Amino acid sequence: MSCSFQLSLVPSPPNLKMSIRNIINDPFATGSLSLAAMSWIITFISSIVADVQGSFPKLTWWGIVFELFVILFLAVLYIVDDIQPHRLSIVGFLAIATVYTTNSANSLVYSNTSAKNCAAAGSILLSMINLIWLFYYGTDIANSVLVARVFGKQGSNPFTTPQPNRTYTPNDINNTNTNYMSSGQLTGLEKGVDSNAYGNHDDSDDELSADDHYPITVRALYNYDANPEDINELSLKQGEVFKVKDTAGKWWQAKKQSGELGICPSNYVETLH
């Protein structure tokens, strides 16, 4: 018994969900990676033509190759759903790539040949995309949300410890077909409430196990102190494993191993299976 108890305290490593849908389902990733790929192709083809026509800055070629590496690196991280742990590396690579693309744009934009001017335009586009990525991956959650909304996404986990959005609604906590749970329902301390207030009681529900009601296992990515003004919120410890009812909205209805019920911010946890 003691052995199994100790093992339960050690969080298992996260499962990598390799799928191209991780990009397709993320509007920010889809838009920015597509634009970056098109800009890179423009720069690459124009640079080949310019090099054939005459002298071409040698350092620009290294910048083009490095930018391709950055784009592929980001795409792979999205495919394996592993962006969060690599944000610091992403920011470092983007800073280097931005230096190369801006230098290439400065070297080519004043040329009198159309091929070099086209390559300069591609380099300028890549520089702009790199700056957007730097802003998105290198700042806190509030700024990341502002950038993501340009592409139609409502937020993403930042590298720094995120701050949950406290303006949640009942639909953020439960499915649209589920009534919002009051504080008393979550704690089990509500008094004087008719058992039929939330629909007819079905005794068969009592026979369901906790795993039936909370089928999704998650793990806390960061420590989180619940808002003392909201008794619904749960405090989390980094690495803590517990169950959630579903993954809809920004706040998930959860049940800890101690049996405590409440809600937790979705950007503080990751699903395990």
From Swiss-Prot:
Membrane topology: Multi-pass membrane protein
Keyword Cytoplasm among record annotations: no
One example of a Gene Ontology biological process annotation: regulation of actin filament polymerization
Ranges that cross the membrane: 28-48, 60-80, 90-110, 118-138
Stretches assigned to coiled coil: none
InterPro entries named in the record: SH3-like_dom_sf, SH3_domain, Sho1_SH3
Residue ranges of domain SH3 in the record: 213-273
Subcellular location: Cell membrane
Keywords: Cell membrane, Glycoprotein, Membrane, SH3 domain, Stress response, Transmembrane, Transmembrane helix
Glycosylation-annotated residues: N112
Primary subcellular site in the record, as a coarse category: membrane
Cytoplasmic face of the membrane: 1-27, 81-89, 139-273
Protein name: High osmolarity signaling protein SHO1
Source species: Komagataella phaffii (strain GS115 / ATCC 20864) (Yeast)
Organismal lineage: Eukaryota, Fungi, Dikarya, Ascomycota, Saccharomycotina
Gene: SHO1
